[in-house]
Amino acid sequence: MKITVLVLINVAIATAFLLYLRKPGRISYYHRGRVWLTWLSIAVITLMDELTSVFYAPAEAYRFIGPSAIVFIAFTAFFIHYMTTRMVEIAEILEHHGLIGGGVYSFSYLVLGPMVSFVAVASIMVDYVLTACISSVSAVLNATSFFPMFHTANMVMVLGIIWAIAGMNILGIRENARFTFAVFIFAAFIFLNLIASGILDLDGASVARLKEGAHHATMRLQTGSWITRYDVFIASIASCILAYSGVESVLQTAGLVRSWKEIGKAYIFLALTVGLVTPTVAALALSAPIDFSLHEGDLITYYATLVNGKLFGIVVAGLASFALIMAVNTAFVASSELIERVAHRYGFLWMIATNRRQSLYRIHILNALFFSSIILITQGSQMILADMYALGLIASFSINMGSLIIYRYFRGTKDVIPFNTNRVITLLIWIVFVSCFIFLAIRKPHGTMLWASVTGIVLFAGFLVAQKRAPEIKEIEKTDSEMDLILSLAQSSAPEVKLFFLRPREMAWGTAKDNEAYITFYSPRQGTPHKLAQNHFRLALAKSDLYSRILAVLKVVEYEMPDRQVTVYIGWPMSSWLDRISIGVMVFKLMRLPRLFPNFQFNINYPGRGIS
């Protein structure tokens, strides 16, 4: 019966792929002078990266939380893939602002500015470093599952993989979407056969272990006070989060597709594939009669041997090693693109010099040296690398969610209406991630040391660079000053001075008068707005908030023009105060101005659209 079922499954898989691929344009297509990838292509690229986690994450989760890993790996799958709806929202926001690609770094730069965005750079770099390191170690452990070797030989092979991938990238040899899709087809056959075989081989003992896992998870969550239960909940998610590493990679590929909507489709595909395959394979493997302490590095490979024999185990080991090596290559490519983006933004052109094959060879060499140093420091220990990896991964998620909350606080949903998520739920997700980060920082000293060290170094370098090379410096140089405003108003002999505070995109006013000044505050990260008239003054929000800058302007006017009657005009806020909470906070602050400047007149008005 088992053979019959497997034959039917394989025929169904082959038929499905043949029917789907018969139509052209399923992987890539040509539009307006450029080749674009489809949503399926970028989903498969991320899938092959994310799916590699199944070869090491279940064993790591079991090591920390025992049988309840069966339940929490499944719950974490739902939690993480629900969180990806926020990634889609971020992709939409980035596209709205013309920031295509760059993912976490571009979004954190937009929201948090150059200094804090270096924390995101550090977290992402830690992810890429540890992706390369743990994938190369796991690739060797799976490859040598049937041919045990000495630790020194394993270390040589791990370093060999890293430098071989570096050499391929230096020579300009790159994988493409079609090659990745071919590997995905092969992986689909292997994993579906593994799942089907595992389900058919379930016996009473395996079912009992599954029930034990559910009971163990329930008992842990029902013991002690609510604080203890929350601690158990956070510890369990933090221990399973590694199973879904790489899920953020879709956001990094936004520059390869035409619209943010393709990102949304890709995340739905990942939820229906990796979101189901990973917890299913993990549950089957963790319910099998295996001594997990002896098979932390090759759990899935050994489980495949149990259900379908040694030959199938060798095939799974081959797939695992090949997919993990592809993940190493992904880490090289992604980290080089991130460093290139940062170097280009801050003018370090020597770092992004290319060779004859258009390869960022200097960055690849630096990456290989850094990856190798981490392997040597950790002695190729999958356990230590996993501890480090989880911390950096959760740090990136926390920065993403925090940046989104801050963006929505200030901007609401008016700018990007088609797709937006519930901010309260986003806040709850952020709280969970921050709690996981705190838990791992306390319990995983190796990961904490690495993340803190790299973050500290990058932040220090970022501080030095941002002081002299930040793109905002050129934009700030274009700004007007308060004294320009005063000198302009001083040319008027009128007894009254009128100050109009404009939003960056407001343009309409009547004939300009010499006793009037129109003031626009802008963020240097979004560029200097166009000067609309001689009495239009653009002031940068560099190191202070909007209210503080308004206060500073009014104090200068009060000091320099004590004999003039000053009238201040502020536009009526049209945004919903619930949608843009910052509007309500701003209006509350503006209510203080009459007390601070009792001799000024203040008007918050709406001019109306007129009658046609």
Residue ranges and their predicted role:
Residues 3-13, 157-214, 267-271, 386-399, ...:
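Membrane-interface loop-to-helix entry segments
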Residues 16-23, 185-220, 282-289, 400-414, ...:
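Hydrophobic alpha-helical segments and their helix-loop junctions in multi-pass secondary transporters
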Residues 50, 55-58, 120-141, 239-257, ...:
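Membrane-helix boundary/coupling elements in multi-pass transport proteins
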Residues 2-21, 31-34, 59-109, 115-123, ...:
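Extracellular loop-to-transmembrane helix junctions
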Residues 103-109, 113, 266-327, 348-379, ...:
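TM-loop-TM module centered on a large, flexible mid-protein loop between adjacent transmembrane helices
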Residues 29-32, 185-252, 256-259, 272-276, ...:
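Helix-loop-helix junctions that connect adjacent transmembrane segments
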Residues 5, 9, 67, 480-612:
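Cytosolic C-terminal regulatory domains/tails of membrane transporters and channels
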Residues 351-362, 397-446, 476-478, 484-486:
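C-terminal membrane-solvent junction of multi-pass transporters and transport-like membrane proteins
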